[in-house]
């Protein structure tokens, strides 16, 4: 019998080490079992990478993280080349261990008290008019990291009062009341929390999360701030059906969510959950039509769509796919 992994504080556990810590075991995918990517999933890299390297250097200089890098987002080159990034606060080690996600798991260190100021200065230096701030899950903190979110929002607005801020928050498991008390005092311009997938697959895809809890978080923030758009997203291709996706969309509307993102799941490594199917661009268009018919004010649906992909355009209701 193999010895259990003893996690050291501040150490990132990825791939096989991370998956070994998940109760619901996932067998590594053999190369011959991988689904071949269709033509529509091919990414063209920009010819000039100087802007990309500049953003990475600014992140390193200030000890900041982007979810673009930490989660191996397929749109990193495009977004960085356009001077945009989704900032990930509260460190780069997550207390959860979702088998679809490439963010490292482990025992995180204490939050950096100077991060809000460093984040605000970096955003000001980049001249951003719209920024997305997300975080790892911090189940080790009494408020789940809510006060740190609020401090970051305040610091960013102090540097640039006209900036638009979207927060992509964790579920604040067991801490919803405390977190909402904090976040409703310093609300963002868009409140985003992703359901990720359909409830039937939650035990496999989001161990430690609860579908109805996530819906309630979105609903309660909307009740406190009816004027602020709420947003959620799903990855598709993990074994769900289109009918199940549409039912989740209905649940989101019933809980007051007004903005939707749907994108194709991509397997970060062979140790993560495998892709079960590639959803065609035509199917994404059909689901977008369903979403708009349900009353979503905006729905970004396409193979490369992620919740923060061209988030500024999404917030303006412009076409993103």
Swiss-Prot record:
Binding site for [4Fe-4S] cluster 2: 94, 98, 101
Subcellular location: Cytoplasm
Main subcellular localisation: cytoplasm
Biochemical pathway: Protein modification; protein lipoylation via endogenous pathway; protein N(6)-(lipoyl)lysine from octanoyl-[acyl-carrier-protein]: step 2/2
EC class name: transferase
Record Gene3D superfamilies: Aldolase class I
Domain Radical SAM core: 80-297
Chemical reaction(s) catalysed: [[Fe-S] cluster scaffold protein carrying a second [4Fe-4S](2+) cluster] + N(6)-octanoyl-L-lysyl-[protein] + 2 oxidized [2Fe-2S]-[ferredoxin] + 2 S-adenosyl-L-methionine + 4 H(+) = [[Fe-S] cluster scaffold protein] + N(6)-[(R)-dihydrolipoyl]-L-lysyl-[protein] + 4 Fe(3+) + 2 hydrogen sulfide + 2 5'-deoxyadenosine + 2 L-methionine + 2 reduced [2Fe-2S]-[ferredoxin]
EC number: 2.8.1.8
InterPro entries: Aldolase_TIM (IPR013785), Elp3/MiaA/NifB-like_rSAM (IPR006638), LIAS_N (IPR031691), Lipoyl_synth (IPR003698), rSAM (IPR007197)
Record field: transmembrane: none
Keywords in alphabetical order: 4Fe-4S, Cytoplasm, Iron, Iron-sulfur, Metal-binding, S-adenosyl-L-methionine, Transferase
Name of the protein in its database record: Lipoyl synthase
Organism field: Klebsiella pneumoniae subsp. pneumoniae (strain ATCC 700721 / MGH 78578)
Lineage of the organism: Bacteria, Pseudomonadati, Pseudomonadota, Gammaproteobacteria, Enterobacterales
